[in-house]
Amino acid sequence: MGCCGSSTVDAEEHLDYSGGNVTLVTDQKNWDNTMEEVAEHGKTVVLKFSAIWCTPCRNAAPLFAELSLKYPDIVFVSVDVDEMPELVTQYDVRATPTFIFMKNNEEIDKLVGGNHEDLQEKFEQLNRPKLYDDV
């Protein structure tokens, strides 16, 4: 799997999302519970596929946590590609970080890479009011 820049690091076991409202998925049961809750409430969810060894993933973690506070109606989920390879295959993740935006269990957008401006723009697009239903 590709990474937008990687290095070996002596880091914590998971990326640091302290101060944010990010659910860290580490096993299938946790994933199932999280997605059930999302489905019950009809919320938009953003999946961040990342790895501890990926420098852009680590760099994007504080912004992801910040966005989780800015957009409380969106569910933020972090998936470690090394711990959940079946989800990597299911969502066709080919590089880290990859952000997948979902609504009603359907993928509505995808962003590959850790560019902060691009990520912020995706959230702004997602939250813009639509003037017409058919646009």
Curated annotation (Swiss-Prot):
Gene3D superfamilies: Glutaredoxin
Organism annotation: Oryza sativa subsp. japonica
Principal cellular location given in the protein's record: cytoplasm
GO CC annotation terms, alphabetical: cytoplasm
Protein name: Thioredoxin H5
Annotated SUPFAM superfamilies: Thioredoxin-like
Keyword tags: Cytoplasm, Disulfide bond, Electron transport, Redox-active center, Transport
Thioredoxin domain mapped to chain residues: 13-128
PANTHER family xrefs: THIOREDOXIN-LIKE PROTEIN 1
Domain of life of the native organism: Eukaryota
Role summary: Probable thiol-disulfide oxidoreductase that may be involved in the redox regulation of a number of cytosolic enzymes.
Any Pfam family hit: Thioredoxin
Family, per entry: Belongs to the thioredoxin family. Plant H-type subfamily.
Cysteine disulfide partners in this protein: 54-57
Entries under CDD domains matching the protein: TRX_family
Cellular compartments annotated: Cytoplasm
Active site: 54, 57
